[in-house]
Amino acid sequence: MATTSNMFLYSLSIQPPSTITRAILGQFSGTKEQQIVAASGSRLTLYRPDPTQGKVVPLMSHDVFGIIRDLASFRLAGSSKDYLIIASDSGRITIVEYLPAQNRFSRIHLETFGKSGVRRVVPGQYLAADPKGRACLIASVERCKLVYVLNRNSQAELTISSPLEAHKNGTLTLSLVALDVGYSNPVFAALEVDYSEVDQDPKGDAAQNVETVLNYYELDLGLNHVVRKWFDVVDSTASMLFQVPGGSDGPSGVLVCGEENITYRHSNQDAFRVPIPRRKGATEDPSRKRNIVSGVMHKLKGSAGAFFFLLQTEDGDLFKVTIDMVEDAEGNPTGEVRRLKIKYFDTIPVSNNLCILKSGFLFVASEFGNHLFYQFEKLGDDDEELEFFSSDFPVDPKEPYEPVYFYPRPTENLALVESIDSMNPLMDLKVANLTEEDAPQIYTVSGKGARSTFRMLKHGLEVNEIVASQLPGTPSAVWTTKLRRDDEYDAYIVLSFTNGTLVLSIGETVEEVSDTGFLSSVPTLAVQQLGDDGLVQVHPKGIRHIRNGVVNEWSSPQHRSIVAAATNERQVAVALSSGEIVYFEMDTDGSLAEYDEKKEMFGTVTSLSLGEVPEGRLRSSYLAVGCDDCTVRILSLDPESTLESKSVQALTAAPSALSIMSMEDSSSGGTTLYLHIGLNSGVYLRTVLDEVTGELTDTRQKFLGPKAVRLFQVSVQKRTCVLALSSRSWLGFSDPVTKGFTMTPLNYEELEWGWNFVSEQCEEGMVGVNGQFLRIFAIEKLGDNVIQKSIPLTYTPRKLAKHPTQRIFYTIEADNNTLAPELREQLMAAPTAVNGDARVLPPDEFGYPRGNGRWASCISVVDPLGDGEELEPGVVQRIDLDNNEAALSMAVVSFASQDGESFLVVGTGKDMVVNPRRFTEGYIHVYRFSEDGRELEFIHKTKVEEPPTALLPFQGRLVAGIGRMLRIYDLGLRQLLRKAQAEVAPQLIVSLNTQGSRIIVGDVQHGLIYVAYKSETNRLIPFADDTIARWTTCTTMVDYDSTAGADKFGNLWILRCPEKASQESDEPGSEVHLVHSRDYLHGTSNRLALMAHVYTQDIPTSICKTNLVVGGQEVLLWGGFQGTIGVLIPFVSREDADFFQSLEQHLRSEDPPLAGRDHLMYRGCYVPVKGVIDGDLCERYTMLPNDKKQMIAGELDRSVREIERKISDIRTRSAF
């Protein structure tokens, strides 16, 4: 198979994975501030919890291009900084340090110990670090354990030893922690199962007697080797360990968590056991046992032995576990355990990790859905919850005991302060432009159970509106100004109308003032605070300089008026209607002095711009002049060459706005002077203005909308930004992490004018006008450029479909092992409710009641927008499925036999068992749309032998994938009518696509099959299939011969039908040839060719061909299970493909992945990469040090700016 391709695609992530598989706490900056490092897919993200605002702020994110399996933090003795250990699929142990000054991770050590990839005998699955930072243990699922000693050398640098082996054949490791032993030799505890006897037993009896063992491995620092110090048999269901504080803080040892039991174990202590309480409630199964799935230990300040555990079950219930110790005569704990205590604490969503911060917050990395940030209200010590003691229960779990129960309740000890968006698991995705804006929106269904959501994703920045006030007239412009240079806040809002000017004072309230010195009878063109204590008002007939209550007026020459103006704190430039430029500069005494000569331009001046005066300088060196002859000229303002032309740039349309400003620049690493240009055609340009020569270079452009662009310099998060106003409002800024320039739309009203606004109540806001409204608003987050709006759903969504004409979506939802509403109601109404009271708990907090083998499923009608007045966005109708049916597939089908009327068709399965796959029967439900699609009317359902797993409209009929069968149905009065069928798939059809009379069938385990439908003979004939077995999850047709798809192992691929086979299948009368053609290797006679292949490290669940930006080319958009949204952008020219291929090769060697994985091997995890260039790697170029950028640019024979422009352009022209 050739690894080169004649098709090239550029793979980009537009939304990184949002699941968090591992989260750890540490002081990674070297200060006392705690931070959280989270692993999301291949990304490491550093978060800073802000206790004052109750928020979690992402500081930086780094793609390691590898599978992060585990994380651990450690701190060397005497140090104040935590280091991070990464266990990944690279077969290497990686130690990294966070450098706060550069806001990046730096790799300190990379030690190879085994093969790459996730393998059962290669360490990396488990990682534990000694609490005193002296050693770490990295283990595999089977057999291997390696211990590394961590130390310092004479230069106080971190060193790592050669690995010490602690292998044991025939053992499986279930859990691993480091014991807290103070400064004794480091000890690691492991839960292990010995399977060597089971392996040798042909009858299988030994499997019944397998024991789970708790082993202690001690690292002898003196002898430099590892020994197995102690072991003990524990409960056979044990699966998780938690470290118990030791030394002066506690008794040391571990908590061993098994099915419905938590046991304290240590080598020199007795065992103590408490059961995990079960839920009480009418809908709860009183015999169901729980397991601990996550937890955290927290030490309290101030007293020895003060610590507690918060342990969570699979229901989300948190239990507080504490250890009582024997006290000496003075009442101090001795370190000998007296008993174990457990009590119900609160219920929160099920988590992968819990982190308790010293500031009194709890970070919950949710298993599914949004991550949560809680504040502790209290520690649950004085509530009325029942507490259970180990003294009341036997140590041996096999001995009988009375189960204990509790009533779940709303949270009392924890208060939710922030929810962090996460789309894990993302089940389906559609693109549509329902809001009729320039760019379409992405609609997704994600989440699990009652925390599932329907989300609208929109490219833009969220805006926080502070004030929206209606004005007596329609203003054309607005400014704010201080009275003195050293004032902290703005004093006036100045509004310009067509016939006058209104001045408002800013204070506790905003009021009109008249004694300001401003001329109110004319419209205003510019307002500026000048010098130390002056104000300037530019109006069509002149300039007013107001200082200490004295007004100096400069009047424009007779029969001429001012048409454009530019100001800064020391300079004023105006353009007259005659095409002349008049320039003023402030004297040493604070008055404005006019330059003797006027500069005459060739056309009418449309816009002017002066940059800010650089610190330590007297003036801005350049004036930008835009004329109606479609040019921009740069004029010098230096005393020896005042108003001399330095450079000129031709434009495609007349400039409507100019703005010179200094902004952060990724190319130079510092700040650069830019000229921003807005054109009448709606195009925005950004060009570099050389501070020495005045030349204009490196022009980049973006189409913002059909209206002329206005530009304003604003400040957001202490960064200089450009506000660009067209048919939408846009903000241009340097990305906080990459420093690359980004132009992002604002999720706000269309504005006509904008300006900075600084007051006591709003320290960094903006003021704008649209129509008769004055609006004051602020932008809080610059990093997140995708806005999410959520609508809650009932159960886990499975598929999403859109109404063919209306702004309505339909979802099918199903949850396994969950009681359906009718069963819940029966249990609640039963007079003999055996398990407590009949309180109904909100399912989004407590989940739905469990029922083994039961399904809860429904069809929801979702209105994502509402009408803005009476109807709110939300679920407008829900149809619950009964009979233990679960919805699996859905399609909107237009039946030709019903005059093209569209129906919603839903495939269901009855009494399904997921693994091994079992069912009793399947059905196809048909619903008619009514009330403009807002209601569904049940027509009939058709019984089929297997649950339909894929449905599709096809030539005015329905095509269904039912097991291996492909079947065509038409709509009858009482049921669907079977028209044609064929067995086309080896195992199970999971996806269908069609063009013309060709159907593309995706098999669950055997890739794609191309099927031709012959209407003359009403036959379905497979004529081409795949070369390798792909476990298909989703597919879409790229063109008539090519199909893009994805599989369960995280691969994206494009397959193409051979040209000859494609033509043969379409020829009239070819069915005889196709049916009797010779099979090849138990498949069809033709094989599909692989055109492109790449590994994504997520499971793509949906893929579609779409357009994401105005005027952009079509891309392949895919959504992954972990919340990833990515695009594959086709290259238009071979030259671009070759350039990015070369760039990718250089970055592989110059910026190798942080965790040591080979990038090419990573992207070719299962099949070698073919025809796909990694855009996420190419975008790391902007974050490289300057010397590396220059070196790569030299190798590619290009400038740094040129490379960065190409990287930026390919993203902005096709995605966001």
Swiss-Prot record:
One of its GO terms (cellular component) is spliceosomal complex. Gene3D superfamilies: YVTN repeat-like/Quinoprotein amine dehydrogenase (2.130.10.10). Pfam families: Beta-prop_RSE1_1st, Beta-prop_RSE1_2nd, CPSF_A. GO terms for molecular function: nucleic acid binding. The keyword Zinc-finger does not apply. Keywords: mRNA processing, mRNA splicing, Nucleus, Spliceosome. It comes from the Eukaryota. GO terms for biological process: mRNA processing; RNA splicing. InterPro entries: Beta-prop_RSE1/DDB1/CPSF1_1st, Cleavage/polyA-sp_fac_asu_C, RSE1/DDB1/CFT1/CPSF1, WD40/YVTN_repeat-like_dom_sf, WD40_repeat_dom_sf. It is found in: Nucleus. Belongs to the RSE1 family. Associated with the spliceosome. Involved in pre-mRNA splicing and cell cycle control. This is Pre-mRNA-splicing factor RSE1. It comes from Pyricularia oryzae (strain 70-15 / ATCC MYA-4617 / FGSC 8958).
